[in-house]
Amino acid sequence: KIQLMKRPKFLAKDKTPLTSVVKYSAIELAKKGYVSDFVLQIAPTCPFIKIKTIKHIIKLLKKGNDCVVTLKKIEHEHPYRAKELNKKNLQFKSFLKNVDVEKFISRQDLPKLFCTSGGIYARSFTLLKKFNEKDFNLGKKPIGVVVDDIEAINIDRLIDFDFAELMSKKYKLR
């Protein structure tokens, strides 16, 4: 039996963090007797998340970690290459102030960095209840699970959808 739970008006705003909605839903379900140790927030905009990734994240949560998120390797838009652009004169300068970014001539020399893929945010129910909209609520020691390029596809724009459709056909995904 599927039960529809509508967002209350205070959570139905454009800038409402999704974690606020997840927290509200988990608490409301707990009031009805559906209590869970963990809550997995799996983005529908990341349609290629693998079952084995979800199972791996659940195992990590069961080992006592209170937050596990999916990460992707930063390849092309590396933070060391980020620039600030002066719109008046079109001059640009490095965004990072405390790093000598000019010494990293080749991208292979750049430090290996990761960012959240947006696919999965998994938290203990205890941690989720503490969410206060002042940070991402990742706990003191968040754990990252690196996903491949296909799993990291996140559909936010039309071009992302077109790319996901192309990859789906090319690799016969789902």
What are these language model-derived features?
Residues 130, 144-174:
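Hydrophobic helical membrane-anchoring modules
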Residues 20, 24, 47-138, 146:
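Conserved core of the sugar-phosphate nucleotidyltransferase
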